[in-house]
Amino acid sequence: MLQHKIVSQSEWTAQRKALLAKEKEFTRARDQLSAERRKLPWVKVDKPYVFDTPGGKKTLAELFDGKSQLVVYHFMLGPGWEEGCPSCSYLADHFDGAIPHLSQRDVAFVVVSRAPLPEIEAFKRRIGWRFKWVSSFGSDFNFDYHVSFPEKQVGSEGEYNYTKEEIGSDEMPGASIFYKDPTGTVFHTYSAYARGLDILIGAYNWLDLTPKGRDEAELPWSMAWVRRHDE
């Protein structure tokens, strides 16, 4: 049982108003940060990436599906894996409901993994997701965006989340954003990794409102409790 200070309604309201002022300050700071994110310079994508999709091979530009903006989630599912990463699966449970709303704002959404397409399709059917999920197998895409690494590099130093660190797996999570101009030229505008993906997990935002919060302090690692939703 949680032990907590108990006060009158009037005292609670006073403290809640004080916290509300901080919450509003945080919201304004987040809005400013989002504006700065949009002002980042872009990098032209020159490499001709090709993906295996249920509709055949498609280029990166073709994944935009008529939109000018593309969100890519880099899902940890490598060649030969029997199932996808539990943490990526936790995050992916939030995708299907958001996609129609993203489409209304000129945004296409696709999940990319390095596993061959039949392996992706098998896991997708098992879980029951509907979002578009394509394979970058045989291309440099995952490696160029620092979410896949040669097996020999696992346990040694590599670049992930814009720093040099020990690589713990040959597949890592991330999200990358792209823009396509009217001429069809594609630009990379943003990528985030690790805790940078935290804001995308709606369930975490709900947990942050509860008395126990995420309740992960005593776990071996923060997401040790996470299970795929069919388990």
Where are the regions a protein language model picked out?
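Non-globular targeting/processing and membrane-anchoring segments
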Residues: 1-70, 75-105, 122-128, 132, ...
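Short His-Asn-centered micro-motif
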Residues: 73-74, 109-115, 120, 136
